[in-house]
Amino acid sequence: LALFDRYGELKFVYAKVHTCDFDVERNLTPGENFYVTTLDTPCGKIKTGAMICYDREFPESARILMLKGAELILVPNACPMEINRLSQLRARAFENMLAVATCNYPETVPDCNGNSSVFDGVAYLPDESGSRDTCILQAGEEEGIYIAKLDLDQLREYREHETFGNTYRHPKKYKLLTESKIDEPFIRSDYRE
């Protein structure tokens, strides 16, 4: 993924960290890092990161991007976007208090079904009782250009006061997450680092 700003400047090149170990993708070399850059948009500057398709299956991908300062994660995708995958994207936005924008191939592409989406990550508003739907755009199965209005001020205000994200983490207690040992039932003969 090559991310360019609106002036044509290359901001970063990202290679998918979590490659699938089947089909043609098993021949790819996984990326080594996640990147965040500041994009100067007509609506203001926004810290933007990216992950690709299968990266969304791993909560650590979005968490690393949040820790690097991302307010928005862009996710190009090429698979069926069904309720569980949409729920993953919703969860990544919610737990990291950031926006997640996904674009997917339309239903005319094999194994894809459109359903591009944007989740703004703002679960509560001070003037509303209860939680709110963080989905601000859900496209259909057809090809198209879709525009979502992301309220950056609302997102930033929310991040300053809510308890999710990085506020109450206990990183010292998560050592097991950085170990590379794989135990049953998760051992696969085609696994590679």
Q: What are these model-derived regions, one by one?
A:
Residues 1-68, 76-77, 81-91, 112:
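Active-site catalytic loop in hydrolytic enzyme cores
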Residues 4-7, 12, 22, 34, ...:
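Phenylalanine-focused residue identity feature
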Residues 17, 77, 96, 162-165:
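Alpha-helix boundary/capping residues
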Residues 106-193:
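C-terminal beta-strand edge segments of enzyme domains
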